[in-house]
C-alpha cells in the first residue's frame, strides 16, 4: 500500500470542502468564493480521492483518514527550515502525518506514519543508527560534559541532562522532544534527543561522560518515519481506535 497522498492546491481545497472544512491550519484557507466545477469533482472521484463501489460513491478511507487527521490534529509542529520541503507535522490519536510542499508548485504531499505503541516500542533500541545521519561536521562539533558527582552517576540519562549546570557548554535551555524513554516505552535507553537553542541534539552516555551531537531535524524526522514504516509496514497501518469519520 502507499503511505502518502499528493494533491495540488485546488484538489486540497476540494478535499477540505468535502470534509466540510474551510482551513488547514497554517497551510491553506479555502477561498470563500471557491466553487469547484463539477467536472473537477468528477475527475477526483474517478482518479484520486473517492472510490466507486456498487454504483455508490464513497471516500477512499485512506485519504479520508489523512484529511480528517490533519484538520482535527491534536497538535501541530511547524517547521521553518530554508530549502526544505517539510512544513508541518500533525499528530492525531496514534498517528503522525508529515506535510511537505513543493517550492515551485502548489503540490502538497501528506506522508502517513503509524505511531502506534507496537510501532514505536522497539524503536528506542535502534537509536544507535542515528549516528549514521549525523554528518562529520556534527560529530566534530559534539559537546562532551563529564558526569562529576556520585549522584549523577546513579541517574538515568534524562535525569542527568536535567542536572547539568554547565549551561555555557551546551545551551541556556533545553527540553526533551521526539525521542525519549517515556515516549518510547520502558527500555534501557542510553540516548535521547533534546532541543536546545533551536538545534536538535542526539545525547549519548559513555562511561562517565555525556556527549551532545547536533542533528539536522528534517533528517531526524525522516529517519524516524522511515524506521517505523520499515519495521511494521502495512500490518499496523489501519489499526485505528476512537476516530469517528
Locate each region found by the language model.
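Short, amphipathic alpha-helical interface elements at domain boundaries
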Residues: 1-45, 49-66
Amino acid at each position: 500500500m502507499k503511505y502518502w497522498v499528493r494533491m495540488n492546491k485546488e484538489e486540497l481545497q476540494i478535499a477540505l470542502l468535502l470534509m466540510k472544512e474551510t482551513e488547514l491550519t497554517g497551510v491553506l484557507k479555502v477561498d470563500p468564493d471557491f466553487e469547484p466545477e463539477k467536472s473537477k469533482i468528477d475527475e477526483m472521484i474517478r482518479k484520486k480521492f473517492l472510490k466507486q463501489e456498487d454504483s455508490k460513491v464513497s471516500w477512499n478511507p485512506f485519504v479520508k483518514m489523512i484529511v480528517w487527521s490533519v484538520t482535527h490534529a491534536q497538535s501541530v509542529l511547524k517547521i521553518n527550515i530554508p530549502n526544505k520541503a517539510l512544513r508541518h507535522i500533525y499528530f492525531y490519536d496514534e498517528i503522525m502525518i508529515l506535510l511537505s510542499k513543493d517550492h515551485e508548485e502548489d503540490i502538497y504531499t501528506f506522508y502517513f506514519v503509524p505511531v502506534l505503541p507496537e510501532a514505536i516500542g522497539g524503536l528506542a533500541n535502534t537509536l544507535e543508527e542515528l549516528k549514521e545521519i549525523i554528518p562529520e561536521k556534527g560529530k566534530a562539533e559534539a559537546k562532551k560534559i563529564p558526569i562529576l558527582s556520585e549522584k549523577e552517576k546513579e541517574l538515568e540519562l534524562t535525569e542527568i541532562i536535567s542536572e547539568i549546570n554547565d549551561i555555557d557548554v551546551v545551551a541556556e535551555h533545553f527540553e526533551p522532544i521526539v525521542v525519549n524513554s517515556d515516549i518510547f516505552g520502558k527500555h534501557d535507553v542510553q540516548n535521547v534527543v533534546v532541543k536546545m537553542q533551536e538545534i536538535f541534539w542526539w545525547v549519548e552516555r559513555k562511561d562517565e561522560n555525556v556527549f551532545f551531537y547536533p542533528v539536522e531535524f528534517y533528517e531526524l524526522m525522516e529517519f524516524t518515519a522511515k524506521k517505523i514504516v520499515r519495521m511494521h509496514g502495512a500490518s499496523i497501518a489501519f489499526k485505528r481506535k476512537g476516530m469517528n469519520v
